């Protein structure tokens, strides 16, 4: 299982702070985020153990994923 934590607008949109899922890849995870459509999830920053990963990354049991809205400023 993969532990997923939500931050920022991602948390607000999904209505959850965290959840567990059985996705094997980031691409699969994008279809399992509660209360969010895939098109909304693909705009999020996806960090795996603190580092950005591709949609093809294969999870290992116990991985921790963070989903958060992009941060911008000026």
Where are these regions (language model features)?
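Ubiquitin-like/PB1-type beta-grasp interaction modules and other compact soluble beta-rich domains
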Residues: 1-73
